[in-house]
């Protein structure tokens, strides 16, 4: 059997295949299921300071013959409720990376401290979601804003921090 373990951003992963942040990472059971199916690590659904219902259905549409488009609107239960889902995944043995989103560097730093306290091994900063006003691309749309967020978060926590940035900017 081939050895696929890797170390990325200071995090040991049993292989380089991760469950990306998204709807499948909303519950502890689905995170644990991805781990049990062989994922090298799992990234949670992006979590904010307060619950968000997201957009009403349909949130996924077929696009001509070649693909699907989705716009969820960052639905999540909020940081007060989500730690129990992380605990379920961690009890299953999963390597969990916590994804967070916020509207400004200070809120990102506060959320980072709360998410780090759950025992996640690293943080993903969602600076790329184009679907929710005041978050994602609106916060991370310029290199200067990304730098402010990353600096605030790395001052607040000691675990690795990964900025998920948008490709949708003219200032790349």
Task: For the regions a language model picked out, list residue spans one by one.
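Flavin-dependent oxidoreductase catalytic cores
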Residues: 1-172
